[in-house]
Amino acid sequence: LLGDDKILGIFGVYAFFITSGFLVTQSAQFGSVGGFLWRRALRIYPALVVCILLSVYVLGPLFSPLGIRRYLRWSNPLETTVLSVLNPSYGMKLPNVQFYDPAISWLATFTNGSLWSISQEIFCYLILAALMAIGLLRAPFMALALAVGVTWQLFFEHPWPDTQLITDFTFIAPYFFCGSLLWFVMEKWQPNLVLASIFAALGVLCLVFLPAYSYGPMLFAYPLVYIAISPSIQLPTLDRLGDVSYGTYLYGWPVEQVVNHALGQYSTWWTVFGLSLPITLLLGWLSWHLLEKHALRLKRISFLQRQPVSP
C-alpha cells in the first residue's frame, strides 16, 4: 500500500488476470463445460471459504470496536460468511471492523480488499463456460471482447480510480480477455523476443506519458507470457515449495492490515511490506499443503470427456 489512494498491488492484479486468462483458456480446450466449471470451483472455493471464515470469525472479533461478544451478537457473522462466499466482494469490508483510524487512510475498514478481483475472476470463468457451450471460445471472439473492453474505456467515463475503485467488471475483464487471446496467438506462433521487447518498451512509454490510462500496463502482457513460456528462458521451479500463489494472494491484504495496526505511527509501506511478506508466504504455503492441493485431487472425479475446442 503506497497511500494517497494508490494501491501497488493493482499491477499484481493485472498480471494475475492476464496469466489466468491464458491458463484457464488452455484448460477450457478439453473436457465438458461442467468439467471446466468443476475444476475452476475446486481451485477457487476451498481456500476462499477458509479465508473468509478466518476473516469473519478471527479478524472480525479481534478488530471490532464492539468487542468480541457484541461483534458476534450484532454483526451477523453467519450471514456475512454466506454472502461473502456467494459474492466474494461482499467480504471486502466486514460489519463493525476497523483496523486503524479511518482518518489515516480510507482503507482502514477493508478486511480483504483483494476479494473484489475474485468475484470478477469467477465472472470471467462463467463467460468462458458460456462461450464453450455455444462454440464461440475462439481467437476472433476473444479479440472482439478485448477490443470492446478497451474501447469502452476510451469513449465512456470510467469510474477508475476516482469514484468506484474496486467494483467495475469492465475495468479488469479486458486483462483476462487479453490473456485468453494470447493463448490462441501462442498456439499458432512461437513467442518472439523482438516483439516482446517492442511491447515492453511501449509499456514503459505508456506508463511514463499516460500513467492514468488503465490499459497501458496491458502492453506488458506479451512480454509476461513470453517470459513464462519461452523455451529459451529457464525459470526456477517451485515444486518443493508448492503453488503458494493463490493463498498468498488471498492472505496478503489481511496480513498487511494487521501489520499496519501493530505498527501504528511507525507504519510505512516498506516496513509493512517487509514484515507482511514472510507471514503471507507462510500462510500461502499452509493453504496449499493443508487444503488446496488436496481439494484439487477431487478433479479426478470430474467430467473427463475430451471435447477439444476449435481455435
Segments the model singles out, each with a brief description of its role:
Residues 43-45, 152-153, 176-183, 221-231, ...:
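Alpha-helical transmembrane segments and their membrane-interface exit regions
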Residues 25-29, 55-59, 132, 136, ...:
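Membrane-water interface at transmembrane helix exits
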Residues 1-7, 11, 45-122, 221, ...:
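Membrane-interface helix-loop-helix regions
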Residues 10-14, 27-87, 246-250, 256, ...:
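Transmembrane alpha-helical segments and their boundary/interface "anchor" motifs
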Residues 14-22, 51, 176-180, 221-222, ...:
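Hydrophobic cores of alpha-helical transmembrane segments in multi-pass inner/ER membrane proteins
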Residues 301-311:
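Short, intrinsically disordered terminal tails adjacent to the first/last structured region
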Residues 78-218, 251, 257-279:
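Aromatic-enriched alpha-helical transmembrane segments of multi-pass intramembrane proteins
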